[in-house]
Amino acid sequence: VLIEVNFQEAFFQNYFIPVAFMSEAELDTNTLIAPAQFNGVSGYLVDALHIEDFRKLLFERIAASAELREFPHIIFHKSSLLGPMKYESSRFMGAEQSNTSIVYNETYVLKIFRRIYISTNPDYEINRFLTEVCRFENTPEYVGSVNLSIGEEDNITIGLMQRLIPNQGDAWNYFLKEMDEVFANLGRKKIKLSDIPDTEHYKRIRLQNIPHQIIDWAGLNLFQKVQQLALRSAQMHVALGSDTRNTSFVPTNFNGDYEVWLKNRLTYQFQNRLNTIENNLHKLEGESMELAKVFLNRKNEIRRRFLDFDWTKLKSERIRIHGDYHLGQVLVDHDDFYLLDFEGEPESTIRDRKVKQPPIKDIAGMFRSFHYAIYSVILNNGSKFPYERDELFVAGEKLYHFICGSFLHTYVDHVQKNNLNIGYTKEIEFLLQYCLLEKAVYELGYELNSRPRWALIPLRGILQILN
């Protein structure tokens, strides 16, 4: 069943529910939708994913790339890179916000998209492209998919099957533990905070050039992991920018249409954030309140920053990107990283998610994620470190600068060696600051609506960029 939900605010969303009938006698799930009668038998309409026979049917249809004769508009596909597949078992991985994941044979994961769009899902498009065209190994391998055909060109993606990646959790939790150890080292090693060196923000720095005081404090392993993640990020972008035939993926230049689209989108988003901060100002206190007032006082300067985008000065190229790239979208497997969930920004329309963007936008998202990891450790665990919170913030900013510099060196070095055109140094820095500001303003709306105490993090990020 495809459902259109209309909201009072004059917009709508589409959802997908696979529905089955179970008689009262065989009912073994609490996912009831409504009572029903079929051929005189009383029972209930239920979510079909909770019936193993239905999960098995999905698997077998994907494995055979076979259509259902009763529903010829449902397109099942299996990757040509895979051999025969036989159903053995299935279980739920756990419900998520916009999809439900089913683990098959402890080997594959079928992601059922609950929130759907009248278009193919970017996660399906990019995952299949990276697997079948690029042979990119550091993303879950594309196994198969389920799409609904609703016209000559329009398909709706309702399922994406991928190979299960054995892992030790996501990079967000991994780096949170690392950061906690780093800050614990301050007291453990009796480090004098004024002795911690700093570096210019966005300045690329080789591992061997990071000051020994930083390595002694944060550890070599942290920066080796940062560099490994930077390498995988660069390889992802090189792969996404490598095609010369598929128009959905061929790199393209900046142009006037993109500039108009970008400015319209960001000025609308910025006005939305201004309204949000004005309506939620009473929820803030202390430094968050002070920074929010500075934000409001400098709103015209921020708006000018967003409007200060001249495509004629940019020589780099745009490609399809991840679009919502942060530490939570990365799995850790021992000493390596796997990149996943290419759906794009949740607030964006499906059309906007497919617009080719500067790859640096993904890097800005990852930098904001590192900033969050540092600040969340201080905000949640700061009382256990023998320093004032403001002192920890200063130390954290210095660490953040070295993390960004180390990441950027590895990333830029790899993409330039592999002929992905991201521009020269000044253009990279302009795009990075522009995208960092966009990301931080985007985050601000989320924090104000859901956890105002954390609004401090994007507010500090915004003012850091402005200053």
Describe the role of every protein-language-model region.
Residues 324:
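Conserved catalytic-loop position in the HRD/HxD motif
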